[in-house]
Design a protein with these regions (language model features):
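Hydrophobic (often cysteine-bearing) scaffold residues that line and stabilize catalytic clefts
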Residues: 46-47, 128
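RNase H-like nuclease fold core
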Residues: 1-45, 53-58, 133-142
């Protein structure tokens, strides 16, 4: 199966109450919206959780394109993670990688599929990214 996933995270304060949202489209363009929240979190944790929860909804061995407006998520999974693992989950500055627990989960889930990561500009003309943002923002208060 082929899927497109649009993800977003939001936080009211950083840290503070946060929400995540994702729009999952299958190859026939059937749409599933998912969202959730945490009481005390950060925007980066919500961005990561949006991708994690979306990937959990998809069967293994699928072709997936994930669209995120988070440079942190895109660069983390496509560039930085290889170095972090080699350095024992430490950054180039020898500090512990923030959100290591979520990075590990995301890495495990993406390995079960063929995932391509794409960055999209937030708050622009992409209706599915805007919907993911809306889901994340609404989830903060639920």
């Amino acid at each position: 199966m082929k899927f497109k996933i649009y993800t977003d995270g939001a936080c009211s304060g950083n840290p503070g109450p946060g929400g995540w949202g994702a729009v999952i489209l299958d190859q026939e363009n059937n749409q599933k919206n998912i969202s959730g929240n945490e009481k005390n979190t950060t925007n980066n944790r919500m961005e990561l959780l949006a991708a994690i929860m979306a990937l959990k909804k998809i069967k293994s061995n699928s072709d997936i394109v994930i669209y995120t407006d988070s440079i942190y998520v895109k660069n983390g999974i496509t560039e930085w993670m290889v170095k972090w693992k080699k350095n024992g989950w430490k950054t180039a500055n020898k500090k512990q990688v923030k959100n290591k627990d979520l990075w590990i989960k995301l890495d495990e889930l993406r390995k079960k599929n063929n995932v391509v990561w794409k960055w999209v500009r937030g708050h622009s003309t992409n209706k599915y990214n805007n919907l993911a943002d809306e889901l994340a923002t609404q989830a903060i208060n639920n």
